[in-house]
């Protein structure tokens, strides 16, 4: 009987212990992924509702941005305005996380929160997720305050903070997670971060890289 030669490029077979460990990891991950994520849904809905209210409040159409066409709305909407923050309105470093400039801005951030939020909420629980979200968003707004003079707002800083959390989680628990998940949480995130930061340097796009980087490294 002819026995075929093994493929030298084939990955080594798992031992029984390694196989059982891999199955156990998949089961643990499956249980975690079934956990409900109510806070993520609440945050997405809250951000969208605030944008809808601001949109009609500013009486805008198309791609016009109410905050840059209506000085009163800049003052009352909760945006990060450096002069007002310096005058003592530090609450804007928190409120600005929930204020978005146009439909593309809210759509991009709502989608990012919808994708990344459930993972962080499931891995850390809703209380720590809320703390991480607000802390990252505030750190992003603070970085924007020091490095970007223009008024700004949005959940981008908080979302980049979630990216940072998942990167750290993927590295820290790389031996406990299935390899495909660990790789997705680390190497899979880097191209997206590089692309998002890169387009932020384009003059044609009003993106606040100060908030993005502040949230990411918080």
What kind of feature is each model-predicted range?
Residues 2-218:
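A detector for small-residue-rich transmembrane helices and their helix-helix packing motifs
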């Amino acid at each position: 009987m002819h026995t075929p030669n093994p493929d030298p490029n084939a990955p080594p077979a798992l031992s029984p212990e390694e196989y059982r460990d891999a199955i156990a990891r998949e089961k643990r991950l499956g249980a975690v992924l079934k956990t409900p994520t109510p806070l993520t849904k609440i945050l997405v809905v809250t951000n969208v509702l605030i944008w809808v209210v601001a949109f009609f409040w500013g009486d805008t159409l198309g791609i016009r941005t109410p905050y840059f066409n209506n000085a009163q709305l800049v003052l009352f909407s909760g945006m990060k305005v450096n002069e007002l923050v310096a005058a003592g309105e530090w609450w804007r470093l928190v409120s600005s996380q929930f204020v978005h400039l146009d439909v593309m801005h809210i759509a991009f951030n709502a989608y990012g929160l919808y994708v990344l939020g459930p993972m962080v909420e499931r891995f850390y629980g809703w209380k720590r997720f809320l703390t991480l979200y607000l802390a990252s968003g505030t750190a992003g707004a603070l970085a924007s305050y020091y490095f970007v003079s223009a008024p700004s707002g949005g959940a981008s800083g908080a979302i980049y903070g979630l990216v940072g959390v998942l990167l750290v989680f993927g590295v820290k628990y790389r031996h406990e997670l299935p390899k495909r998940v660990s790789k997705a949480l680390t190497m899979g995130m880097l191209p997206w971060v590089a692309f998002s930061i890169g387009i932020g340097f384009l003059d044609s796009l009003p993106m606040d890289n100060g908030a993005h980087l502040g949230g990411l490294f918080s």
